[in-house]
């Protein structure tokens, strides 16, 4: 049936997965709604069937398998890990802040629902910014324990990484290495607006 397609395109846009379905002629069918801001991977299925399977994970979602129907566009949980962690109790959101030279830098901030944004919450800021490596969202028991106990976990995607391609990578290497540190400092300075404070 030429009206449906087995073709899915998975790309990272602003450090998170964006998945789209296409027909065989290359025309777009739809953008697939993912469970949240995170990483999708491992797409597979049989051409004779209408389902495609994929994995999804982020800072509040343990790696979970989903079944996607190419005809209806609906996704359902296929295999869920036996982890005592309720993702519905947490928020993982993407923001953009301004670095020293005016560059907009993406950052994912994760915390427990009901958190008082009073600037007094313990916060971990984790960044890398080097070797063309992209920091993409993934579940970690250590991070889960941190946010479960009231902590905030923030991951800025510093220049030097691979999130925006070669230009972004080059913007944080060699003579531009100072940008990496400026990006990290700007992330730390952004957070006291609502989440934590600087000492």
Predicted regions, residues:
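Structural motif
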Residues: 16-20, 61-66
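Conserved beta-propeller blade repeats
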Residues: 3-6, 37-55, 93, 141-144, ...
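Coil-to-beta-strand transition motifs
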Residues: 14-16, 60, 102-104
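Cap/lid segment of the alpha/beta-hydrolase catalytic domain
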Residues: 72, 79-194
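Multi-bladed beta-propeller domains
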Residues: 3-5, 24-42, 71-89
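Single conserved hydrophobic/aromatic residue that forms the stacking wall/gate
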Residues: 1-12, 197
């Amino acid at each position: 049936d030429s009206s449906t397609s087995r073709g899915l395109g998975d790309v990272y846009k602003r450090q998170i997965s964006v998945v789209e379905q296409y027909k065989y002629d290359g025309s777009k069918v739809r953008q697939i709604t993912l469970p949240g801001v995170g990483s999708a991977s491992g797409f597979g299925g049989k051409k004779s069937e209408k389902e495609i399977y994929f994995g999804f994970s982020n800072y509040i979602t343990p790696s979970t398998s989903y079944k996607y129907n190419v005809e209806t566009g609906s996704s359902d949980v296929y295999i869920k890990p036996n982890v005592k962690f309720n993702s519905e109790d947490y928020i993982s959101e993407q923001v953009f802040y301004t670095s020293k030279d005016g560059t907009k830098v993406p950052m994912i901030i994760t915390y427990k629902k009901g958190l008082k944004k009073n600037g007094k919450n313990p916060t971990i800021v984790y960044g890398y910014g080097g070797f063309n490596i992209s920091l993409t969202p993934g579940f970690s028991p250590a991070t889960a324990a941190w946010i479960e106990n009231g902590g905030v976990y923030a991951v800025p995607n510093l220049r030097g990484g691979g999130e925006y391609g070669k230009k972004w990578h080059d913007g944080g290497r060699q003579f531009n290495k100072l940008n990496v540190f400026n990006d990290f400092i700007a992330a730390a300075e952004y957070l006291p607006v609502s989440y934590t404070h600087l000492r």
